Amino acid sequence: MSLLEQLARKRIEKSKGLLSADQSHSTSKSASLLERLHKNRETKDNNAETKRKDLKTLLAKDKVKRSDFTPNQHSVSLSLKLSALKKSNSDLEKQGKSVTLDSKENELPTKRKSPDDKLNLEESWKAIKEMNHYCFLKNDPCINQTDDFAFTNFIIKDKKNSLSTSIPLSSQNSSFLSLKKHNNELLGIFVPCNLPKTTRKVAIENFNRPSPDDIIQSAQLNAFNEKLENLNIKSVPKAEKKEPINLQTPPTESIDIHSFIATHPLNLTCLFLGDTNAGKSTLLGHLLYDLNEISMSSMRELQKKSSNLDPSSSNSFKVILDNTKTERENGFSMFKKVIQVENDLLPPSSTLTLIDTPGSIKYFNKETLNSILTFDPEVYVLVIDCNYDSWEKSLDGPNNQIYEILKVISYLNKNSACKKHLIILLNKADLISWDKHRLEMIQSELNYVLKENFQWTDAEFQFIPCSGLLGSNLNKTENITKSKYKSEFDSINYVPEWYEGPTFFSQLYLLVEHNMNKIETTLEEPFVGTILQSSVLQPIAEINYVSLKVLINSGYIQSGQTIEIHTQYEDFHYYGIVSRMKNSKQILETNTKNNISVGLNPDILEVLVKIHNTEDFTKKQFHIRKGDIIIHSRKTNTLSPNLPNTLKLLALRLIKLSIQTHALSDPVDLGSELLLYHNLTHNAVKLVKILGTNDISINPNQSLIVEVEIIEPDFALNVIDSKYITNNIVLTSIDHKVIAVGRIACQ
């Protein structure tokens, strides 16, 4: 065969082979699609069956392995313990059956479930039932609930009773031991297995000890029991029934107030002012002697006492008022003195109140300014020392008290409804032999200051030269008859012929008569009193009484009425009943008179008050001070219909002041510390605000409204908001220079 034939044959065979392959391929595609689907399904089933068999086999093997050893506290996890308790018995049985059936069908060699596994499942169910049974019987007295193994012991005891007849002893003991160990794992103290044995033992011992909270509670209980043992319970005496406070006590005497006021003597208050050693006390003492207020025998006793003192600073008339040992030794007045005069030498139905004030700069502000504000006198008596160089020193010295006094009294005169009167006594005229030229020079200088600087008119002031030691020009000798015999204390009434003016007493007499035309006290005025002096008496039959010296600033008071005493350092106030009242005098001799039933403005009375024994009042804590305020009980108005009930009492720490400044050497800035004088009190305050302006300082000669705050923390200023009370104040610097005078703006 040729080469071409062979090649052709190969091509034919090749084409036949390709055709048969295509046919077979197409037939296989059409025929094997279903077959391939069946094959794939069988393959997947086989794979899933194999995987399922493998998983079941692994689970079965794992169960067999877990049943080969006894679980302990450290190998069994908490999740396995909880899962064993949560699964139901039926689920476990079904799972077991499904596992055995699948293993038989697949003919895989697996181990059968051991009887120990079945026993463990049954014991788990029994344990759950026993736990429920224990919870139901937990109140059984045979169970010690404080024991950590109470539950396990209960189960063991119950098992012994239930299985003693049916289970052999060996299996019973092993079952109980395994159950106890299982319960210990659930309810015992967990300690990591990797710890040493000694550490585990110490940890368990620590948990068995009391906790820190238990230790604290035990200590508290022991302390309480100890105090309870030491407690001595005594029978508490019954509290005494306190007398209820009657706020509607009527007066002890029924008096027609209208007729009493109409016949009551009218008073003129005269306040003596001046520099130290100006002779105020000597002059006033001699005047009291001339007014028959001091007897001859008393004067001789005083003369003996004054003979032992320095004659340059003391005399018989001076020691009448300087009646304390300190004042007599120092030779100058230190305290104010108040004298009330009521005798036949005065006009009918009139009284005279004389007030002596200290002139020393150390006591000037404390006593003098408070006296001016408290007593609000109708007459100011300015005593001037006319001796050579004395007048000039008083003007040129660093503390020009005369000018400071004129600042205060001039403002009060300008803003008072009733104009004041000023008497200027040119004292010690005998030491200059009544030098007319010198007396006129002093008078001219003061006249200019009063008119130009302080706007006094000629009718409001009067100059009177005199001698307080000799009594010259104090009073005419023929008007007073003390004795038919002459005395060494009688006035030497030497007055030069060129003087044609009045004597001091004659001028007072005219002012007393003029004062009788003033408006009388009305029933609308509320009763307000200022305590000048306080003393606590010994309790009488367990009833507390206090004796008070009271200045009546407004209205009237009757014996038997209930009053309120308001202190300035405490938040509470006292209630009391006025037991009795009598006129007060602060000189050596006092005429003993019967008690009075009514006190009027401006009387100074000694008042005995019965204090209600409230909780705030004790014998050791009784605080009534000078400057405290007495008012009518504001709840009384039924039994005494005439009593006013419109009084408003304010306790202020932040105070608004309407002031008039004077000539100042330096402006007073905000935040500066000042002294505020009001009635008998003076307190340090801080300048807080200047109202109505953007200024940050107080300048001279300004009318301002300012706010000040009291620095002392426990003090509140008692202020009466009434048109009958003036509430005048004085502001001074720390070195006692008068800065401004004004009044408290209550509104």
UniProtKB/Swiss-Prot annotation:
Q: Where is this region: G3?
A: 356-359
Taxonomic superkingdom = Eukaryota
- UniProt lists compositionally biased (Polar residues) regions at 21-31
Q: Where is this region: G2?
A: 331-335
Q: Where is this region: Disordered?
A: 14-51, 89-117
Q: What biological processes does GO assign it?
A: nonfunctional rRNA decay; nuclear-transcribed mRNA catabolic process; nuclear-transcribed mRNA catabolic process, 3'-5' exonucleolytic nonsense-mediated decay; nuclear-transcribed mRNA catabolic process, non-stop decay; protein catabolic process; regulation of translation; translation
Task: Using the UniProt annotation, give all residue ranges assigned to the region (G5).
Answer: 467-469
Task: Tell me where it resides.
Answer: Cytoplasm
Any matching Pfam family: GTP_EFTU
Could you say which residues bind GTP here? 274-281, 356-360, 427-430
* Residue ranges, annotated region (G4): 427-430
Give Gene Ontology CC terms. Answer: cytoplasm; cytosol
Q: Partners and quaternary state?
A: Interacts with the exosome and with the SKI complex composed of at least SKI2, SKI3 and SKI8. Interacts directly with SKI3 and SKI8.
Quote the record's miscellaneous comment: Present with 233 molecules/cell in log phase SD medium.
Q: Which family does it belong to?
A: Belongs to the TRAFAC class translation factor GTPase superfamily. Classic translation factor GTPase family.
Write down what this protein is called. Superkiller protein 7
Organism annotation: Saccharomyces cerevisiae (strain ATCC 204508 / S288c)
Q: Which gene encodes it?
A: SKI7
